[in-house]
UniProtKB/Swiss-Prot annotation:
HAMAP family: RecA. This is Protein RecA. Belongs to the RecA family. It comes from Streptococcus mutans serotype c (strain ATCC 700610 / UA159). Keywords: ATP-binding, Cytoplasm, DNA damage, DNA recombination, DNA repair, DNA-binding, Nucleotide-binding, SOS response.
């Protein structure tokens, strides 16, 4: 019986060695034909955690779960007209430039306002802009920029405005069934691998349409077919909510609107989270406003009555004064922002100072102990 078991083990080992050798040979051949890294074990990848770039909004970074837009992925931002889609995308452009990256904007709608973009923090002198004549041209330009590996962010505004060449050359009234959907499907197949390889973030802004004859369920849909929905790692639904009234001399005027951004699809974190941001007309997302609200909810900024305090010092009476204080003191703004991100687990806590202080404390304790021992020895000698 023992001999039979031993024989079986030998056969199994021999068979296993043969399979391993066959796999090694196959991997060598694949590497020879297609280059190093064509096939690898998942654990061998240097970067296992998804890299992200901040969206430019703290509330949206928290809703996204990972701390921002994932690099090397496709993002779709859609919603009704004038809901703030382009504003959200321009904040991402400003953040990419702030991080030292290069951003490109494919303006298929031919409606980008340079003055508004600059007000949101975009360096318009460094922004690459293209206003293509057709959908194919716009997607080809986006593809070449992505393939270069030198661009960190590409924004396409919008998918609905990417008109196929055949439709432009034809007459108004001609039927072009599924033409745009086929164009987008082909583009997604070509771009997705390049986007992932170059770690470029591709943001596609999209409009809303309504399906005809829908009696039950949601009649809303987005143009361009289903390909973009499938290839997107993140999809954001942007909707304007209530108007924001001004204060003081502007108390009778609407100075902005509260906007809800819902993460309807997320492949890198749990989906269906919502972010509520204040979009101020002419200024964009109020970063100080969202920080005051979130930090107050977490207790990082203390609120007593109408007064807001941080680290025991009052920073303003009323939210507007607190916002103004943070806008005038960027160092304190960054400090509070860092603490909020640490508390939500978006970034790792920097324990360098804590480790250093604990080390100094330990050194002091050792010095005190040595001093006590020396005093004891001195007393014994005197005795």
């Amino acid at each position: 019986m023992a001999k039979r078991i031993k024989k079986t083990e030998e056969i199994t080992k021999k068979f296993g060695d043969e399979r391993k050798k066959a796999l090694d040979d196959a991997l060598k051949n694949i590497e020879k034909d297609f280059g190093k890294g064509a096939v690898m074990r998942l654990g061998e990848r240097a970067e296992q955690k998804v890299q992200v770039m901040s969206s430019g909004s703290l509330a949206l970074d928290i809703a996204l779960g990972a701390g921002g837009y994932p690099k090397g992925r496709i993002v779709e931002i859609y919603g009704p007209e004038s809901s703030g889609k382009t504003t959200v995308a321009l904040h991402a452009v400003a953040q990419a430039q702030k991080d030292g990256g290069i951003a490109a904007f494919i303006d298929a709608e031919h409606a980008l306002d340079p003055a508004y973009a600059a007000a949101l923090g975009v360096n318009i002198d460094e922004l690459l802009l293209s206003q293509p004549d057709s959908g194919e041209q716009g997607l080809e330009i986006a593809g070449k920029l992505i393939d270069s590996g030198a661009v960190d962010l590409v924004v396409v505004d919008s998918v609905a405005a990417l008109v196929p060449r055949a439709e432009i050359d034809g007459d108004i009234g001609d039927s072009h069934v599924g033409l745009q959907a086929r164009m987008m499907s082909q583009a997604m197949r070509k771009l997705s691998a390049s986007i992932n390889k170059t770690k470029t973030i591709a943001i596609f802004i999209n409009q809303l349409r309504e399906k005809v004859g829908i009696m039950f369920g949601n009649p809303e849909t987005t143009p361009g077919g289903r390909a973009l929905k499938f290839y997107s790692s993140v999809r954001l639904d942007v909707r304007g909510n209530t108007q924001i009234k001004g204060t003081g001399e502007q108390k009778d005027s609407n100075i902005g609107k509260e906007t809800k951004i819902k993460v309807v699809k997320n492949k890198v974190a749990p989906p269906f989270k919502e972010a509520f941001v204040e979009i101020i007309y002419g200024e964009g997302i109020s970063r100080t406003g969202e920080l005051v609200k979130i930090a107050s909810d977490l207790g990082i900024i203390q609120k007593a009555g109408a007064w807001y305090s941080y680290n025991g010092e009052k920073i303003g009476q009323g939210s507007e004064n607190a916002k103004k204080f943070l806008a005038d003191n960027p160092e304190i703004f960054d400090d509070i922002d860092h603490k909020v991100r640490v508390q939500y687990g978006l970034i790792e806590e920097d324990n360098t100072e804590e480790k250093q202080s604990s080390k100094e404390k330990e050194t002091d304790e050792k010095a005190d102990k040595n001093l006590v021992l020396e005093l004891d020895d001195t007393i014994e000698l005197e005795d």
